[in-house]
């Protein structure tokens, strides 16, 4: 799987950073792509990448602030002409996202050539799609804002070649039956596939947060995540200022990483007042401290594979 950032700035775009947008490539589990937030200019950012809008079958919105949704109407209309014709799209977000899109499309007299299924979240969402489990929990941002916990499917355990050879089954196409089915037939005998495979392997857990100040639900979302994407609007100075505006300070994020036992964290949504050079300087300073957990301040077009 791979996460790509198309926008990493908070509130306003800068000359170096666009507003928020994240793509989650589901390979090898699926050929589809999920987007998380669509800030203004997202579709233009995507033009500089190999991702195709026709592969986007889900869009998740964390909250209704403009730097997270102003690019959505344009991206939806462009999807009609970039491989999305006739391909259903599921749009998940806070209450109001459906009215926002339908009103924008109606007033601009825009037509889509594919269906949209809207799922509006009140307080919590539990959603399943092709083996993926998605949980959304309310955060603390002054308006409804959500964090998403994505659990990838279990994958079949490794085939025990030695055990299969003991019954006379040599490596070949038949091994796919063992891998993909509960039972398989060989020489007129029905076998249980699980007797010839290792334990199923748990897929990665990804936590993607909307804007928030520290709150109890954060640890539920991030618990033992392999990868966490979290905002840090404030990456230096007095953290009380961040919390006054219902945002997170980098110290808040580090505390969450430790308490939730997160493997690695990708930090985005840094204030638009920071230049890339300033972010890099602060990053080096933080990483020089022995207590700093594994993290990265991401830039536009950064990708992380796992």
Swiss-Prot record:
Active-site residues (renumbered): 67
Molecular-function GO term, any one: zinc ion binding
Presence of the UniProt keyword Protein biosynthesis in the record: no
Keywords on record: Endonuclease, Hydrolase, Metal-binding, Nuclease, tRNA processing, Zinc
Main EC class the enzyme belongs to: hydrolase
Binding of Zn(2+) 2, residues: 67-68, 211, 269
Reaction(s) catalysed (UniProt annotation): Endonucleolytic cleavage of RNA, removing extra 3' nucleotides from tRNA precursor, generating 3' termini of tRNAs. A 3'-hydroxy group is left at the tRNA terminus and a 5'-phosphoryl group is left at the trailer molecule
Chain sites annotated for binding Zn(2+) 1: 63, 65, 141, 211
Entry's cofactor comment: Binds 2 Zn(2+) ions.
Keyword Metal-binding applies: yes
The protein's assembly and partners: Homodimer.
Function of the molecule: Zinc phosphodiesterase, which displays some tRNA 3'-processing endonuclease activity. Probably involved in tRNA maturation, by removing a 3'-trailer from precursor tRNA.
Family: Belongs to the RNase Z family.
Name the record gives this protein: Ribonuclease Z
